[in-house]
Amino acid sequence: SDSLSFSFINFDKDERNVIAQGDARLVGNNILQLTRTDSNGSPVKSTVGRILYVAQVRLWEKSTNRVANFQSQFSFFLESPLSNPADGIAFFIAPPDTAIPSGSAGGLLGLFSPKTAQNESANQVLAVEFDTFYAQNSNTWDPNYPHIGIDVNSIKSAKTVRWERREGVTLNVLVTYNPSTRTIDVVATYPDGQRYDLSVVVDVTTVLPEWVRVGFSAASGEQFQTHNLESWSFTSTLLYTAQKENN
């Protein structure tokens, strides 16, 4: 179909419209927990989990030169007893058969394999990451402060903005893609009005196949936190775009 729309006001325990990968669990209390916790509900080391929406999304259509205009709206919160919790959560778009890469816990956020994490030609993933890990000897590809980043086929973000991680506070996020300007826009807000904006120009037809799946990924390494998804709505519609110039 030319358009797709779905909405989770919250997540039921028996939710059948999501595919869970790795340590992701529907824990009841209307929350989808992406990384593992112990029997007390406390976060643990070395965990990675993802969820995907069950239906595939038509991102673009070569035969008609149409590209999807999409928007993804979601909210999440993070909790940890540590002062430098890790690693983060990401909304991502990938080929329909996408699976958790081996060795992708920790700073690779469940999205990239260690060998090819910065090799753009080896990857097919578009992601918006909320990265909480920072240390002086931090991941070499990251700024040394918590940040929001837009990732295009690489764990090294195309663009980042400094972000304040707030313990247990819900962040509301809107990610939109406009095919006529080829721009991904991210707006993230806390309940008190603190706002973060980020945008990148990217032609999705050069990054991803025509059919994709959309979802979320999160991971922890040596440092840890819970990654709790509270709500998610998504809508996409194929639109006619101007013919690409043949350079």
Curated annotation (Swiss-Prot):
Transmembrane regions listed in the UniProt entry: none
Pfam families listed in its UniProt record: Lectin_legB
Binding site for Mn(2+): 129, 131, 142, 147
pH dependence, entry free text: Optimum pH is 7-8 for hemagglutinating activity. Activity drops rapidly at lower or higher pH.
Entry binding sites for Ca(2+): 131, 133, 139, 142
Residues given in the record as a carbohydrate binding sites: 87, 107, 138-139, 221-223
GO molecular function, one term: D-mannose binding
Gene3D superfamilies the UniProt entry points to: 2.60.120.200
InterPro entries named among the record's database cross-references: ConA-like_dom_sf, L-lectin, Lectin_LegA_CS, Lectin_legB_Mn/Ca_BS, Legume_lectin_dom, Leguminous_Lectin
Temperature dependence (free text): Thermostable. Retains hemagglutinating activity after incubation at 50 degrees Celsius for 1 hour. At higher temperatures activity drops drastically and is lost at 80 degrees Celsius.
Subunit structure: Homodimer; non-covalently linked.
Protein name (record): Mannose-specific lectin CML-2
